[in-house]
C-alpha cells in the first residue's frame, strides 16, 4: 500500500485500524445473522446517505476475504497478528515516547529562552 506524501510509519497504524474495523464489522454481522443490509432510506439531506454508502462499500471488502480466508478470521490468527504487531511496533513505545518528550521539552525551552527579552531572562548576578 503506497500513499503519496505519507511516511511509511503512518501506514502501519492505518492498516492495523482497518483490520480491527473489519473484525468488528464481521463480529457485528455474525451477531445479527449476517444478512445483507437493506437499501438506505431516502432522506431530505444527502449527508444521511453517507453511512449507508460507506457500509455498502465496506461490506464487499469484508465479506469476500472472510469467505476466501476463513483461517485468517479465527481468533488464534488475529491474536498472533496483534502479538506480532505489538512486538514489532509497540514494544519500545514507552521508551521512544519518553525520549521524544524529553527532546521536545528541551527544544521548546531553548526556543522559549531565545524568544525571551534579554532583560527578563538574562542569567547572572545583577543588582
Swiss-Prot record:
Biological-process GO terms, alphabetical: lipid storage; lipid transport; positive regulation of triglyceride storage; triglyceride homeostasis
Secretion signal span: 1-27
Pfam families named among the record's database cross-references: APOC4 (PF15119)
Keyword Transport: yes
Presence of keyword Transport: yes
GO cellular component terms given for this protein: high-density lipoprotein particle; very-low-density lipoprotein particle
InterPro entries (UniProt xref): APOC4
Keywords: Lipid transport, Secreted, Signal, Transport
Subcellular location per the Swiss-Prot or TrEMBL entry: Secreted
Family note: Belongs to the apolipoprotein C4 family.
Function: May participate in lipoprotein metabolism.
Protein name: Apolipoprotein C-IV
Species of the source: Camelus dromedarius (Dromedary)
Gene: APOC4
